[in-house]
Amino acid sequence: MIGEWNNGTGRRKSSVARVFIKKGTGKITINDRDIQVFFGRETSIMICRQPLFLTNHVETFDIMVNVHGGGESGQAGAVRHGITRALIDYDATLKPALSQAGFVTRDAREVERKKVGFRSARRRKQFSKR
């Protein structure tokens, strides 16, 4: 399996996606389900396919993804990051275009932790003057 497949690992928020690509017809499978079934929102599907549209490889590769953790938005971002890394593993000349679009850089934004004495990360308890 390793010989014919190129792989990449993508991360976003608390989601991790392991992506495997090989020459094929453009079928994307996420956790043994079609991408249309796995992601309900069209926006998430578009986010996943962005690197393929940018490099004109929409119907060139069959993509198999294992993703876990986080929610729909984080998983879509993790899949996009993983597909980008797998494309670079397949053809390193694609890296400048993908990097220019900002797909190579891992989005480092994480949820800020809740602080003691606050209701959430930054929201304080209501102040009562009297």
From Swiss-Prot:
It comes from the Bacteria. GO terms for molecular function: RNA binding; structural constituent of ribosome. InterPro entries: Ribosomal_Su5_D2-typ_SF, Ribosomal_uS9, Ribosomal_uS9_bac/plastid, Ribosomal_uS9_CS, Ribsml_uS5_D2-typ_fold_subgr. Keywords: Ribonucleoprotein, Ribosomal protein. One of its GO terms (cellular component) is cytosolic small ribosomal subunit. GO terms for biological process: translation. SUPFAM superfamilies: Ribosomal protein S5 domain 2-like. Belongs to the universal ribosomal protein uS9 family. This is Small ribosomal subunit protein uS9. The gene is rpsI.
